[in-house]
Amino acid sequence: MNSDINMYLGREKAGIMRKRALLLRKGCSFEITSSASEDLGCRRGEFSRKHYGSVELLISSDADGAIQRAGRFRVENGSIDEISDYTPGTWRRTDVHLENPEYHTRWYFKYFLGKVHQNYVGTDAEKNPFFLSVVLSDQNNQRVPQYRAILWRKTGTLKISLPYSPTKTLSVKSILSAMNVDRFEKGPREILNPEIQKDLLVLEEQEGSVNFKFGVLYAKDGQLTDDEMFSNEMGSETFEKFLNLLGDTICLQGWAGYRGGLDTKNDTTGINSIYTVYQGHELMFHVSTMLPYSKENKQQVERKRHIGNDIVTIVFQEGDDASPSFKPSMIRSHFTHIFALVRYNSQNDSYRLKIFSEESVPLFGPPLPSPPVFTDHQEFRDFLLVKLINGEKATLETPTFAQKRQRTLDMLIRSLYQDLMPDMHKNMLNRRSFSDVLPESPKSARKKEEARQAEFVRVGQALKLKTIVRGDAPTSLVTTGLCRKEPWESQSFCSSFPYDIVCGDSWGQSLLVATDSAGVMLLEDSPTLPPVQVFDKTLTVKQMHVLEPQDLLIARADKGKDARLYVYRLSTLKQGIEERQLVRTKCDSRENKLEKTKGCHLYSINTHHGVELRIVAAIRNKLLLITRKQSRLECVSSIATVTGSTDSPVEEFQYIREICLCDSPVVMALVDGPTGENDHMICVAYRHQFDLINESTGDAYRLHHVDSNRVNFVAAIDVYEDGEAGLLLCYNNICVYKKVCPFNGATPMIQPNTSDFHFSWNQMPNATVCAFPYILAFTTDSIEIRLVVNGNLVYTAVVPELQLTASRSDIYFISSAPINSASNCSSRDTSSQSSPQTPTGYEMPVFPSPLGDGETQSKHIYKIPLSNLVGRSIERPLKSPLVNKVLTAPAPSMTGPAPMIGSTTSLSLSRMEIKEIASRTRKELLGLTEEPSSKADGNSVKQRRMSKKNKEEEQKRTAEISIAEQVGMESVDGETDIQQLCPSGSEVEVRDDSPPTANPFTFSTSFEDDILDLK
């Protein structure tokens, strides 16, 4: 009996401890009260896939109750997690982002095509052919030169960006090595034939279409079978209202835009359809009531043929929420993977959304708000279209579609390789060794090389123009009046800081930084207040943490054998600053040393340090575990009686144990156990591996092995999915998520988990920051923003000479870009013929001039509030991206003024002339006549109706406009000739919960200018 009671109490205690640990990780505390920023800092690593629905077995039955079909689908209905603090009546929204947007992912079209670049062919160690494309470009407002490389293989494309150095040459071998390709069966040879651009563009287009077709199925109240739904000849008034919200009604006869598989000649697929353009994507909707209806055919095969072959289908169902609801198992289709169920509530004029995704479809955003009810119809349209586009892209990553794409890529690459091999010994392939540096044009063959490059550019620009005219160009955001605040927008914190910053951390609204030559300084959040020196240069701090709830500053100072950890009371430092005492020196810090940490080269603290602060110091190949237990109340009382206590908190720390490793760790992270009772772990990275070390026993477990010749460890970030620990392991340009819970006693179960995933950064990061739902990579000259749950790219911004300074709370980074840089500097002005190979006869990119002797370049500090990234991802109301419906042909007419919201034109007079030339060129190609801008909407359909005669004349005109192409393509590139800016003085709607900022950085949203605009 007693044993049963003890066993029961033991289970209850374990359950209570797990719940307690979970609440602690969510920012709750039983002993102290953390600041708001501290709570956010603890929440940044908390995430849940439950926001994206849960997998359910859905069964449909007929009227007699017999089971017809069953299937496993992930259901998203905006439900609230039972342990969340949701308040009824509050809306929980997330930011709406297109994932993996084509204007960031279609590199070859954007950066290579129509520019002088180099292409190589070779075979790897497994005798699989591959192609490599390399270009040197500075297509950004900061004129930051970057090497961009694309590796084409049967498994897909791998993209990487490498920093440019005028003093260091870059070889093809080093580029391939950065892509983890070190062994070859045949070394790469350069391809000189300009026609290779067409084949490589075809390879890139295998990533998926830039245009989409979606099914729209109308279901009356009570209809539970697909035959009943497809047999609805007409829709209701509310359904017609919904269709008008989605897009515009177009006449299919003679339609020359994206047709989505519909007949545009003989009306065999209906007379009208719904069409729109959203952020550069052409969308065609297969509407069930607009497709041909047959009274004799009850199954409506013609309708099912189109809608059943759509990957994504919208189901508009009449009736209230209490009536029987649609289930995906009601539809007999092996091709449709995603269903969006839409219901309209006439009482409050709102739409309710529910998403069903086949189980194999990867997670995609944006997650549904809670509740998933939209009263703003434009807001609903934006959310729905982005959700559908992201859903179709995610479906293409399922095994079924991925295997088909891999077979197609393999066939295309092998076919292209076989076509090139007969010319291996001819002039088509350059015999230069793959270990040679990217070559310069030989002076003896300057004229020949100039002619070859001119032909290469001409072919590429003509190909780009044809792609644009055809409507297949990845020109996202061209047709939008997009001008909105993004959560990652930065604020100016300090301009023209004269010292190099080694490390830093936020202290309230201020920033504490350690410099290389001026000691430690406190920077206030005010341009009028000068920096305050806290420590002089005798104390060289290499790493620091400011823990306000603990009233503690931890710093690692000095190097080599003299390195140690120092601990200070923040209250003592603050008092010294306020009383304007003398600046502290290294000698003044003798009482603040943790002596046993002598020789420490790295340390790490636990993220959730509300109750117990744990520090692990690495001293060569030895780990020293240190703890400090003291509540905030005790700390406050000790401060109040500071006359009777010491200024140094050294005595409050205790050394727990030492753990020996087989090598010195390069990266460390502390992982909280599920109960907090002797089950904490330490993640260490060394050699070619990440290991987990049990804090209590010192036992090591292999977490991840890095299969690469060279390893550059970046970070190990502890994250907690629904309370269970996981790790984001970052090395080279790879990020891997590993789940390390649940624990079995003291042993973590580190078997492969279905929730594990990995993705590649486009550039090797120097630091990474996790702020759910985002993970940010800080590279040498860019910030790359992805989603934590799936690794999908959201945005890339170019920031020159970038360095992350602090990220424990708000994110601070430094850059050489001045605050008042010209924000209207168009990237297309300086991106003409940029290439690794010096293009004789063409203008080279304007690279920043090196500093002279004795010159020092000032740094500028910027801040991204963590509340914008973490807090607003759950609590911020969704704002419409202000994207208007567009009914237009993909080949745009630029005679009418583009609608701009508080924006300014960034084109000079010469740029406007180039724009006119490009516009006339396209009109000549299409055979269009000049139309007044006021009639643009009315004649947009007519613009797409090209006669056979015009189509024949188009081919003749193409040969006559090569000169106009070369002049105009720089403005045609991406079909964006006007950079729409959001100046700080413009009257743009700002979210209420966003702090007022000068907003020196703006992440531009035009096709070419995907950078931080400096204002």
From Swiss-Prot:
Residues 949-959 have a biased composition (Basic and acidic residues). InterPro entries: CNH_dom, Rap/Ran-GAP_sf, Rap/Ran_GAP_dom, Rap1_Ran_GAP. It holds the Pfam family Rap_GAP. Residues 200-416 form the Rap-GAP domain. Residues 821-842, 924-1004 are annotated as: Disordered. One of its GO terms (molecular function) is GTPase activator activity. Residues 498-812 form the CNH domain. GO terms for biological process: regulation of small GTPase mediated signal transduction. Residues 823-835 have a biased composition (Low complexity). Keywords: GTPase activation. SMART domains: CNH. PANTHER family: GTPASE-ACTIVATING RAP_RAN-GAP DOMAIN-LIKE PROTEIN 3, RAP GTPASE-ACTIVATING PROTEIN. Belongs to the GARNL3 family. This is GTPase-activating Rap/Ran-GAP domain-like protein 3. It comes from Danio rerio.
